């Protein structure tokens, strides 16, 4: 059966995960791209870092009259709720989604997600780089980098290409081929998308067979905590 999924991409106003200023969505149904959308978003707090502006070109003036993420959530939620979400470096994009929802006190949606960085590294190990722009150049996919809708479109194209090149037709086949553990978001936690560890000797696995697969202790606070970074000068001005 052909795969249905939604590729997403966030751009942020600062290095803080919850400072989303743009979201791109690319909907794929029956292996066909059917919708590409971009939402401009007014971040909370309304602060921009010049470094981020240089990357994506979104200025405070461009979003000052746009809705905040909580105002857009009723529109965005149907695109992600109970869907398979795909992102290039999914830990960032799902982290941005959860951090932003947490900022507004909104319950997380329920969804599964996979990462095209992890997949492309295994699918195309000889490529010089697996950054989205370089990966797409190697695959002949044309897009405009660091525009959220374009990045979501490119990410969708990458997954469709991997499925085609390896003759795969389902999420189960994809995960089996590339030894991937699907990431999950629940109303109170986020479980990472990981490469499965190779099985150890049987005596080791027998002792652990009763251990639950989803570690629910990966709670909200942990899910939205971004890596501690030294604040950049431009962030603190």
Predicted region positions:
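Ser/Thr-centric signal marking residues that sit
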Residues: 10-12, 116, 155
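Histidine/lysine/aspartate-rich catalytic loop segments that bind and position anionic ligands
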Residues: 110-120
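Acidic, divalent-metal-coordinating active-site segment for phosphoryl/phosphodiester hydrolysis
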Residues: 147-161
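Conserved non-catalytic scaffold segment of RNase H-like nuclease domains
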Residues: 1-111, 125-126, 132-146, 186-194
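Acidic two-metal-ion nuclease catalytic site recognized across multiple nuclease folds
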Residues: 160-237
């Amino acid at each position: 059966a052909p795969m249905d999924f939604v590729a997403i991409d966030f751009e942020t106003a600062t290095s803080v995960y919850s400072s989303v200023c743009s979201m791109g969505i690319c909907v794929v149904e029956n292996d066909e791209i059917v919708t590409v959308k971009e939402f401009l978003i007014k971040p909370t707090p309304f602060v921009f870092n010049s470094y981020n502006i240089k990357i994506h070109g979104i200025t405070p003036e461009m979003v000052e009259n746009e809705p905040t993420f909580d105002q857009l959530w009723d529109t965005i939620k149907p695109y992600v709720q109970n869907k398979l979400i795909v992102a290039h470096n999914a830990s960032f994009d799902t982290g941005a989604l959860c951090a932003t929802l947490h900022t507004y006190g909104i319950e997380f949606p329920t969804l599964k997600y996979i990462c095209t960085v992890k997949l492309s590294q295994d699918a195309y190990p000889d490529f010089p780089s697996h950054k989205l722009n370089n990966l797409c150049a190697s695959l002949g996919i044309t897009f405009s980098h660091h525009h959220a809708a374009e990045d979501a479109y490119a990410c969708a194209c990458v997954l469709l290409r991997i499925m085609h090149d390896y003759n795969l037709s389902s999420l189960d086949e994809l995960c089996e081929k590339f030894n991937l553990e699907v990431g999950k978001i629940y109303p109170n936690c986020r479980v990472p998308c990981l490469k499965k560890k190779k099985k150890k000797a049987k005596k080791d696995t027998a002792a652990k067979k009763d251990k639950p697969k989803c570690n629910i202790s990966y709670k909200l606070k942990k899910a939205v905590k971004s890596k501690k970074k030294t604040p950049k000068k431009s962030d603190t001005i």
